[in-house]
Amino acid sequence: MNFSVITCPNGGTNQGLLPYLMALDQYQLEEFKLCLEPQQLMDFWSAPQGHFPRIPWANLRAADPLNLSFLLDEHFPKGQAWKVVLGIFQTMNLTSLCEKVRAEMKENVQTQELQDPTQEDLEMLEAAAGNMQTQGCQDPNQEELDELEEETGNVQAQGCQDPNQEEPEMLEEADHRRKYRENMKAELLETWDNISWPKDHVYIRNTSKDEHEELQRLLDPNRTRAQAQTIVLVGRAGVGKTTLAMQAMLHWANGVLFQQRFSYVFYLSCHKIRYMKETTFAELISLDWPDFDAPIEEFMSQPEKLLFIIDGFEEIIISESRSESLDDGSPCTDWYQELPVTKILHSLLKKELVPLATLLITIKTWFVRDLKASLVNPCFVQITGFTGDDLRVYFMRHFDDSSEVEKILQQLRKNETLFHSCSAPMVCWTVCSCLKQPKVRYYDLQSITQTTTSLYAYFFSNLFSTAEVDLADDSWPGQWRALCSLAIEGLWSMNFTFNKEDTEIEGLEVPFIDSLYEFNILQKINDCGGCTTFTHLSFQEFFAAMSFVLEEPREFPPHSTKPQEMKMLLQHVLLDKEAYWTPVVLFFFGLLNKNIARELEDTLHCKISPRVMEELLKWGEELGKAESASLQFHILRLFHCLHESQEEDFTKKMLGRIFEVDLNILEDEELQASSFCLKHCKRLNKLRLSVSSHILERDLEILETSKFDSRMHAWNSICSTLVTNENLHELDLSNSKLHASSVKGLCLALKNPRCKVQKLTCKSVTPEWVLQDLIIALQGNSKLTHLNFSSNKLGMTVPLILKALRHSACNLKYLCLEKCNLSAASCQDLALFLTSIQHVTRLCLGFNRLQDDGIKLLCAALTHPKCALERLELWFCQLAAPACKHLSDALLQNRSLTHLNLSKNSLRDEGVKFLCEALGRPDGNLQSLNLSGCSFTREGCGELANALSHNHNVKILDLGENDLQDDGVKLLCEALKPHRALHTLGLAKCNLTTACCQHLFSVLSSSKSLVNLNLLGNELDTDGVKMLCKALKKSTCRLQKLG
């Protein structure tokens, strides 16, 4: 088993200071934190300043009383922490709290005299460490020494004695505590013995040396002295969360772990207690106590020495979801108050009942979000289950031949979904049980492990093909329907535990249930009398999916809800993107495979309905009637589902109305699913394909040649879509990580004469040399009209790109090189490009340091008679007034340019004045001008107003984010009154007030062309808005959009 820490804030065991810290109000707490600075501590402590550790102020500032107590524990020895708190309280004149702290300090003196750490203490510590080494123990690390100080203030070594030797505390412990340990150990072993583990699974509960060390780290994941008080074990079903928690309990009961930290460990099974009625917390923790009364008062007197293990908390969340929430927000602190169990558990989680106790919680991944709100400073530990090495060990227990094991593992890695599922031991057992059957010799390994559904189907078929079950032949279909109904109803209600009444209601017969127990499909729950669960969640999910494909006595009768439920499931997964139902839907599609259906019918004596596929196709047609069906649902999930079916004809029909696909390929399973489905999207016209991982790169991690070859085969299949699909005209490869082999396949497809791609976008593609190969492949391509290479560091690649695009057969109309690290020198190549061809009409060069010198070169091209450029984007190119002079001169001669974007350049009033020399000509061709964020004022606005009064060809003008003020807009409005062309005006964030609204009112009332006006980010008060609204009501106002 393996686990990893996700996150853990500072937290730990505190020594009783928390109640006093919680008594401080907000302002007192802040003052207390300030007093913890070393310089402040010198005022009431005799030690020099350097004697005190400095607590990082960032930690102090954010700390609440609970975290503050942890910080004190972490940075001060026990005795010193108490004296520091007392000294600060005295400084703050908190007399009452001082008296209480002194009283408790006197009580503590009976067991240990509170004093400063002295040289004698340090010598004793070193001596003890030396004694441990002479006894054959490892040298303790700093964390262990810190724990010694924390536990006793003297010298005791935790975790360094022989694991089989009890600590001194164990030898002297009270009789009732010893009996409790023995009772817990006996119950744990009995529980494990009663679990119907599959063959060879018992070894999983044994603990190796490494796992023993992992258990030691479990309750201190960050290896800090201030240990976390709430640890949450998170993981998928069956990866070992409960097993790990039970191992921790068993080690404590055996006296080899957590001895000094915990006097008592309590196990609360949510399976069991969810059915309990109202009780008290004292009664709840006494359930598993031996024959005599539990020492509740002792528990209450040492709360920091208690560990509560809450196993399977999702059961409580599910129970709450079926009824009104019992957590009404009122705190629960009384151990003897009778309350619903869920209320008690929430109070325990919120640190209301036992604030100083440590909690260890296990929960399935899906439900973590519902748990977080109830926790105080939790630490989440991801339980990952079997590692690759664990899998190899497990498979070697089933297959003696190591070469056969490697062959199986190699094949499993091709199916990433199945391989990842094998982190759960029960799934491993399923795989091994299936592959060991004699029947497998008639099926190659690849077909059995091709999909997760195929493996499970063969597994269950093998179990029942020779099973002797005392059941009439005509009873089998009904029994399978009953089992599948139990599975799906449980998932609808998020129920994974079933009592006897549940199985009786579904009509499951005893012989059939016994066979399910025998084959480890179902399992009895020991701590919940008469309760049953599926041995692994994937079994329940498989049979839940099977409930939708089984033929009913009268197939889809009028009262049947199966078709509606099926569509609801698809809605959950494909539209709402809910992960909870994804495995069920995948199994559902997998069961549509004709070969799998035939196998199940022959061995399970059931009938698969042929109408299910018809219903699914109808649903697909309804969804596809939308204008852009692929935008409504998660297309990659649909691809996963169709790949699971492995039904080519069905897939082709389902994807017949898909016109646009957006794929982000991270894993091998996504690559394989895309390869399977894309070739069937015959009406696809736009493909966005992002390979955002190094999955196509052959490195040391991909040792198996067959796996790499499988990936490249899938990739080349995707590339072939560019050739075989005559409707595919747009390809977007942005944010892709490619490499030599993958680029080769892509280039071959783009060079193919049958490729119909017209628009190619390659933003942020790595590595940059990929673009060189692509542009070489595109050289002479007469179909390509749009090319976007923005957000790439082209550098020296620019001349090569432009040279290729100057090919006589090239028909490019749009070129975007925004944010490509271009410089003024690059403009020389761009100028040559613009004068060499006459079909490029739009050039986007924004976010490049072209500067004034670069624009001068470009403007020389704009005046060339062969330049046909219509749109030029030069936003944020570090231009100034000189650039405007060059542009103005060019505009006076150029007869094609109609759109110019100069936004985010510091042109200022001088630059605008230069532009207006060309803009003011009545025969000017410019129709759209963007000068937003160009740092000019009302003076520049006046120049624009004068120019517009002579030129009525400008239709779009954006002047936003300039300091125009009301006076500037007044001049502009006077020019716009007779203007007959302007339909869009941008004045966002221009420091306008209500004073300008009268002028805007006049324009809105008279203009017959203005339909869009942007005034966002200006301080227009109610009167100004009312004036604008008055204009909108006039019949002469043509405005359609006001921002």
Curated annotation (Swiss-Prot):
Belongs to the NLRP family. SUPFAM superfamilies: DEATH domain (SSF47986), P-loop containing nucleoside triphosphate hydrolases (SSF52540), RNI-like (SSF52047). ATP binds at residues 235-242. InterPro entries: DAPIN (IPR004020), DEATH-like_dom_sf (IPR011029), Leu-rich_rpt (IPR001611), LRR_dom_sf (IPR032675), NACHT_NTPase (IPR007111), NLRP_HD2 (IPR041267), NLRP_innate_immun_reg (IPR050637), NOD1/2_WH (IPR041075). GO terms for biological process: regulation of inflammatory response. It comes from the Eukaryota. It comes from Homo sapiens. SMART domains: LRR_RI, PYRIN. This is NACHT, LRR and PYD domains-containing protein 13. Involved in inflammation. Residues 229-558 form the NACHT domain. Pfam families: LRR_1, LRR_6, NACHT, NLRC4_HD2, NOD2_WH, PYRIN. Residues 1-107 form the Pyrin domain. One of its GO terms (cellular component) is cytoplasm. One of its GO terms (molecular function) is ATP binding. Keywords: ATP-binding, Leucine-rich repeat, Nucleotide-binding, Repeat. LRR repeats lie at residues 725-749, 781-804, 837-864, 894-917, 923-946, 951-978, 1007-1030.
